[in-house]
């Protein structure tokens, strides 16, 4: 069972940098329909996140387009493959060739760090639904997110876990070629130090690694009370399985990457004892959440996860901004409208 240690809502989380500037309209033969690009990862090691994001976004679009009072959306999906160069190429394509009014994505923090400047320079809004690393919204005035940053999620998860478990020592294990996980390491160190926890070991690995024996042996020798793991779901699940196989039964605080059903599917019983912060609570007594779950299950035959929920919210947030802007093509009006939305409530909060 995956334990949820902290509750987060989106209110006040979406960081917005104020600014101004002229901009060209997005080209669109049908002025009653807005072209929105979704840059996500549907192939590669992070595909489970991307498939959920795509599913959540497409469900929202289908609902919006069936509503006579809504602004119609034409969603153009690009697979970035979890690769920074692919993300840059996709961003250039949807802005210059497809002439979208705005972009959702890219999916990974590293992709946004690479492709976000392209959108910002072109004065096209790009909103990340799962870009949780530090510095995302510092890219520029056109970069937004509705993802809970690791600086909040991991910090709170560690501090709440410390209140309950009272651990005195910790080890950190993170992917050092992943911008998001490097960010988690920085946040985790600050959070642990702030509550007087001694960090007895830090180990690194790379995305797509499959053998973690050497790192875990060193951590085992350090005998920490708790282990912080920052990884995507595949690596995280393999780390958990190897830990339990080695007799390491310490509680684990995981990064946002653990918030995928695939993590539990791969890790199995080894996922027991994991603590992770999430903005998504499917059992919340809220009609929007109930309706979303019902529609998602009816369309896809499975329950939505956090990534689907955040993408679903992003599309509805964009529709609200389009309506407020009064245009389906004016990129600058869209940005101003999005920046000034203060009362949006979605399925994640």
Predicted regions and their residues:
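Short, low-complexity disordered leader/linker segments with a strong preference
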Residues: 1-35, 66-69
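Extracellular/periplasmic bilobed ligand-binding domains
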Residues: 119, 185-277
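Beta-alpha junction/loop-to-helix N-cap segments that form part of ligand/metal-binding clefts
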Residues: 24-26, 49-53, 63, 67-135, ...
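An alpha-beta-alpha
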Residues: 143-204, 226, 318, 322
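Segments of small-molecule ligand-sensing domains
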Residues: 299-300, 304-308, 320-349
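Hydrophobic alpha-helical segments within soluble ligand-binding/sensing domains
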Residues: 87, 146-169, 182-184, 211-212, ...
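Extracytoplasmic "Venus flytrap"
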Residues: 37-56, 78-85, 107-108, 173-182, ...
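Extracellular/periplasmic periplasmic-binding protein-like sensory domains
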Residues: 243-312, 324
């Amino acid at each position: 069972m995956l334990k949820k240690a902290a509750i987060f809502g989106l209110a006040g989380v979406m960081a917005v940098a104020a600014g101004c500037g002229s901009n060209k309209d997005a080209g669109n033969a049908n002025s009653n329909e807005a072209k929105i690009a979704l840059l996500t990862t549907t192939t590669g090691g992070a595909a489970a996140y991307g498939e959920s994001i795509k599913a959540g976004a497409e469900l929202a679009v289908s609902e919006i387009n069936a509503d006579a009072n809504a602004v119609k959306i034409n969603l153009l999906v690009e697979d970035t493959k979890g690769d920074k160069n692919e993300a840059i190429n996709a961003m250039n394509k949807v802005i210059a060739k497809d002439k979208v009014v705005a972009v959702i994505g890219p999916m990974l923090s590293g992709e946004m760090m690479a492709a976000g400047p392209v959108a910002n320079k072109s004065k096209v809004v790009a909103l990340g639904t799962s870009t949780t690393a530090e510095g995302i919204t510092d890219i520029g005035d056109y970069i937004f997110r509705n993802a809970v940053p690791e600086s909040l999620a991991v910090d709170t998860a560690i501090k709440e876990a410390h209140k309950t478990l009272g651990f005195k020592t910790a080890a950190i294990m993170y992917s050092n070629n992943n911008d998001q996980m490097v960010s988690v390491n920085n946040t985790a160190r600050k959070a642990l130090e702030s509550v007087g926890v001694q960090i007895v070991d830090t180990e690194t690995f790379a995305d797509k690694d499959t053998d973690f024996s050497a790192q875990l042996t060193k951590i085992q020798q350090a005998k920490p009370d708790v282990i912080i793991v920052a990884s995507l779901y595949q690596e995280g699940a393999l780390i958990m399985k190897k830990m339990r196989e080695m007799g390491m039964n310490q509680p684990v605080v995981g990064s946002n990457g653990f918030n995928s059903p695939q993590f539990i599917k791969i890790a199995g019983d080894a996922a027991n004892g994991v603590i992770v912060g999430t903005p998504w609570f499917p059992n919340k007594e809220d009609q929007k959440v109930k309706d979303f779950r019902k529609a998602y299950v009816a369309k896809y035959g499975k329950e939505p996860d956090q990534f689907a929920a955040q993408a679903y919210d992003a599309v509805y947030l964009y529709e609200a901004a389009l309506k407020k802007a009064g245009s389906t093509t004016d990129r600058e009006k869209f940005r101003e409208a999005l920046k000034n939305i203060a009362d949006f409530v979605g399925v994640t909060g």
